[in-house]
Amino acid sequence: MMPSTSLSRADTGPSAALARWRSHLQAKLGGPLDLPPLSPAAGAIAAMAADPDANTALLAEHVQRDPTIAANVLRVANSAAFAPQVPILSLQQAISWLGMSEILSISVSVWVRAQVFSVRGHEKLLSAFWHESVATACWAREIARQSRTSVELAHLCGLLQRIGRPVVVSLLADIASGESSRLTSVERARLVEEFERRAGLALAAAWTLPEPVVATIARRGTTDPSGDWSLQLRQVRLAELLAARMLEQSLDASATEQLAQALDALNIYPEQFAALEARADAVQAALSALV
């Protein structure tokens, strides 16, 4: 992990303390970061999500190279969400039962959670972030499936769109524990929101993530995306709104309007949206298996 850094106690005012935390983050993000490495197997699996020529034999080979990924793929494959008719004891069985698309998504998800969404003392916050990320990824899959576009790529973009948030939490936790009481939960949330894009792009560069994933991180919040990867940006935007609604986060009038705009951007008609909403139970089951 990153070396501990103490802040001076000279400034006791809330605004001065927040300014020092902000300065600390800027300094950290301005230099080399001690980020969790992407294992060769995980990197290859992530790249396969953006490769239309990927095949199941190669996927099985990569999964077998990482015991953590392999064990968790089997765990999820045997969960109630995927309802296997008989116990799944091998990766070949898992791929045959679930298909390459599901195995790709499960593999990336379990690895990302283990490496990034684990900061001691911040389990509750990171659990909430993880639920949001997985729910967004699962909805992105359904949106892509309906439009017959790459579900693997949609899942990856949805899962990693806000990967900068746990990175910022890790950086903040790196400051000496004696100073952490000076940062309130509101201030922490403010700093996470302010720096998540920059941190996410740093992680994307370190992991050499596929270009469409980098685009969804860099351009999150773009109201009318165009150009390269605009389809993935629009899919993930709609997925994020549907995830927020499913997780019972409040959707005010503004968010309801954003939902309508997101549907229009993808040319999704009312009957298509109704069919999409009918997949809510499947999304919830997939979410339960991955969290």
Tell what function each PLM region has:
Residues 1-178, 183-258, 286:
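Conserved alpha-helical "signature site"
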Residues 244-291:
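C-terminal appended segment following the main domain
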